[in-house]
């Protein structure tokens, strides 16, 4: 599956879902992924976040479908178990050349390796095992690490995670990742009113002190107990206001396909980002789909149905058939989500079942 997605132009892979570092063989998995070389698309935005190659979203482009990245669920094993990220336009324009079957040659696995730049590989983790694994992952070919945490105060962190001493382990992991060259390390914090909005400024201070990029994420209706309500969301404007009272921010230009709005502190020390799918949806520039750990493609976090890729694989579908299926699914990607609207229907899976 990795070879197929790379042949379609995928340039980025993120391993996520549960805790990837618990998976046996994750270092070797990264090593194998690092051997692939993206095919078929030239970047139109050469300097995206952290210097990574970006493909500018172009839903109005006559070229139509343009794949960019993969978010890889960690629950499946082997290179046929990767999730994909792809971007498409609504108007079913003709496929770009890279998607035409006659231009997708059935090449040996080795022929798509060792040419050009490698895939941009990242992992999202809770960080508890990162201290010991950062250097092996870097040596295997990993480029970046994102750590998920909802508090930067040690006592609060322990109450949330129920892991005594956990904050020190995670902090050591982030520092090890930074020292290994897996940076800038990103920290994702989901904000929920009445739970951890008092951590906004402490996280900003943490970004400055530790040299990490903190990204605040608006709380979305994807939780198991369905407690989401508009009042639980801490919106982008409030985050900026609270942070601005601590220290002025300057917005940083970013690629349109980036999910986060990026800001630097006025003295140049420290960066934060805000991912605001509720108050400022970015559906029009979304460049991602996922494959869940049970082999289902989801074109949006809030999809009310899945597309069963695993069933095709189980029944012996050829590479061309799998590629055509993926393309067809992406062409059906939702225009937007409907969070907060009267006709909003909750996603068919909660976040824990989607994977990170």
Model-derived regions, located:
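Radical SAM/AdoMet-radical enzyme domain recognition
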Residues: 2-14, 23-38, 112-215
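Catalytic-loop Lys-Pro-X-Asn motif of eukaryotic-like protein kinases
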Residues: 17
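Intrinsic disorder/low-complexity segments
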Residues: 35-117
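Radical SAM enzyme [4Fe-4S]-AdoMet core and its adjacent flexible, acidic
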Residues: 155, 163-273, 277, 311
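Radical SAM enzyme core and accessory elements
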Residues: 280-356
């Amino acid at each position: 599956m990795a070879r197929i997605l790379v042949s379609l132009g995928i340039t980025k892979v993120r391993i996520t879902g549960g805790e990837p570092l618990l998976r046996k063989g994750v270092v070797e998995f990264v090593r194998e992924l690092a051997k692939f070389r993206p095919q078929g698309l030239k970047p139109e935005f050469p300097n995206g976040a952290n210097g990574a190659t970006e493909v500018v979203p172009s839903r109005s482009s006559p070229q139509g479908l343009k794949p960019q990245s993969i978010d890889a669920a960690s629950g499946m094993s082997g290179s046929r178990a990767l999730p994909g990220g792809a971007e498409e336009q609504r108007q079913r324009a003709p496929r770009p050349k890279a998607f035409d079957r006659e231009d997708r040659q059935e090449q040996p696995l080795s022929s798509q390796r060792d040419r050009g730049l490698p895939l941009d590989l990242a992992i999202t983790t809770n960080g508890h095992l990162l201290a010991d694994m950062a250097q092996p992952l870097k040596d295997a070919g990993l480029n970046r690490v994102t750590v998920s945490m909802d508090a930067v105060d040690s006592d609060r962190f322990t109450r949330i995670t129920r892991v005594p001493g956990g904050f020190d382990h995670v902090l050591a992991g982030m520092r090890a990742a930074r020292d290994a060259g897996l940076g800038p390390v990103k920290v994702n914090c989901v904000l929920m009113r009445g739970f951890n909005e008092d951590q906004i400024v402490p996280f900003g201070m943490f970004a400055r002190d530790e040299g990490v990029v903190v990204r605040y994420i608006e709380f979305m209706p994807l939780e198991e107990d369905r407690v989401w309500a508009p009042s639980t969301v801490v919106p982008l404007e409030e985050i900026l206001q609270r942070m601005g009272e601590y220290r002025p921010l300057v917005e940083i230009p970013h690629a349109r396909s980036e999910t986060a709005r990026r800001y630097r502190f006025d003295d140049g020390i420290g960066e934060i980002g805000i991912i605001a799918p509720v108050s400022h949806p970015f559906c029009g520039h979304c460049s991602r789909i996922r494959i869940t750990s049970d082999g289902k493609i989801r074109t949006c976090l809030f999809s009310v149905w899945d597309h069963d890729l695993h069933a095709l694989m189980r029944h012996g579908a050829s590479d061309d058939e799998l590629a055509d299926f993926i393309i067809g699914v992406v062409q059906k990607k939702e225009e937007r989500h409907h969070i907060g609207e009267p006709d909003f229907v909750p996603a068919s899976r909660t976040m824990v079942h989607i994977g990170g």
